[in-house]
Amino acid sequence: MRTERDKMLAGELYDALDPALVRDRDRARDLCQILNATRESDRELRRQIYLQLFGKGGETVWMQPPFFCDYGSNIELGERVFFNFNCVVLDVCPVKIGDYTLFGPAVQILTPMHPLEAGLRRKQEYAKPIEIGSDVWVGGGALILPGVRIGSKAVIGAGSVVTRDVPDGVFAAGNPCRVIREITETDHADVK
């Protein structure tokens, strides 16, 4: 028989109050609470928490707490991912983040969805996975919504609401987020 966790990860309707899922969320939130109470000099303690919290990739992640997530185990991080202050990852479905991706302060990555029909919404929810490529920069306050894929080397403007896929190598911004232009070699000329 399929568990509520199996249904959740498959993007199907599931019961978020299932006791096993509640225990998993409690575990992640307890770890986040410990992490968020650390001092800047507690680097080794933070590293140990990352290894316990994340499904994959806690070895090289860098972050400025506070940080919040639902499960942690559904977050897969590439090399040297950076989260600035107040980031939230609601990882009901898998969240995959590529190497060297940077998140500004208060970015929210949100996989959960709720049925529009009120009766279903009382007891069930569902989610869609999110994938973010390598070398992406997500500006502060951006919201990344369920089912979105952001391509490698993309830049998402601060405060954007990403409701659909963003291709590789573009600057995208707005609410809803849309492609503004491609990132070109001339963009490197501004950096001295």
Predicted regions and their residues:
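Extended beta-solenoid/beta-helix repeat architectures
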Residues: V148-G151, V166
